[in-house]
UniProtKB/Swiss-Prot annotation:
This is Ribosomal RNA small subunit methyltransferase A. The gene is rsmA. SUPFAM superfamilies: S-adenosyl-L-methionine-dependent methyltransferases (SSF53335). Its EC number is 2.1.1.182. CDD domains: AdoMet_MTases. It comes from Paraburkholderia phytofirmans (strain DSM 17436 / LMG 22146 / PsJN). S-adenosyl-L-methionine binds at residues 23, 25, 50, 75, 98, 121.
Length: 276
């Protein structure tokens, strides 16, 4: 790595590691705006994914953490874990490991009620699989606020009939109310990413608000539909024509995958699951 690249990727004596997808947030104005969007309250159960050097961690701790109710954080980089422990002490409870394998439900309060808030500047190289991993814990979560690549956020909030509407749109919109909150330019980071970023808010639907469906089957149906985006659904969903009477359902196969609303995919998946 050249000296200039090293300097650009160095912040507070730490060089950003590409394999961890590290881009450290450094713009204090942006940090303040993000915290204002999150609105942390004293004593809340909150976990930060990928705290990095603590740019977001510090103001979150100031607003919500107590020794009895610390901010939780999941971090993979062991060098950063040591620094964070030294800086924040008992106000930050660190969990060393990969967020893709972490049991976020273990941090929720006992009982069935949603109690956990999740935040983070997510590594862009694992953002989609991490978002899918988090759906398993949606029933324990109050809300999620994430920094993501703007292109991913646009897909998350996309409406049917638009090019951005995708498998990610369907699967996440089934589980969450999703809203884009804030645009973040590359220069807010060190090193600056090559893409624009955005803050997104995700509020899980309560279980009684969800149409009952086997999410594994829903995922299979949606994956098949979007497997060849330019083809009509009569081709991509052909394997389901024996189990689903699409005409009786009022499901038009003369459409492409991006033209179908979430609730229609759910109805197809319900029938497929019932006949399995």
């Amino acid at each position: 790595m050249s000296t200039s690249r090293q300097q650009q990727g160095r912040h507070q004596g730490h060089i950003a590691r590409k394999r961890f997808g590290q881009n450290f947030l450094v713009d204090m104005g942006v940090i303040d705006s993000i915290v204002d969007v999150i609105r942390p309250q004293r004593g809340e159960r909150m976990v930060e994914i990928g705290p990095g050097l603590g740019a977001l961690t510090e103001p979150l701790i100031e607003r919500l953490a107590t020794p009895e109710a610390p901010l939780h954080a999941v971090e993979l980089d062991r060098d950063l874990i040591g620094r964070l422990k030294t800086k924040f002490g008992g106000l930050l409870e660190l969990h060393a490991g990969d967020a893709l394998a972490f049991d976020f439900g273990s941090l929720a309060a006992p009982g069935e009620k949603a109690s956990l808030r999740i935040v983070g500047n997510l590594p862009y190289n694992i953002s989609s699989p991490l978002l899918f991993h988090l759906t398993s814990f949606a029933h324990r979560v109050i809300d999620q606020h994430f920094m993501l690549q703007n292109e991913v956020v646009e897909r998350m909030v996309a409406e049917p009939g638009t090019k951005a509407f995708s498998r990610l749109s369907v699967m996440l919109q089934y589980r969450y109310v999703i809203d884009k909150q804030l645009d973040v330019p590359p220069e807010a980071f060190n090193p600056p990413p090559k893409v624009d970023s955005a803050i997104v808010r995700m509020i899980p639907y309560e279980l009684h608000e969800l149409a009952p469906v086997d999410e594994r089957v829903l995922g299979e149906v949606v994956t098949a539909a979007f497997s060849q985006r330019r083809k009509m659904l009569r081709n991509t969903l052909a394997a389901y024509r024996d189990s689903v009477d699409f005409e009786a359902l009022g499901f038009d196969l003369q459409r492409r995958a991006e033209d179908v609303p979430v609730d229609e995919y759910v109805r197809v998946a319900q029938i497929v699951a019932a006949k399995a």
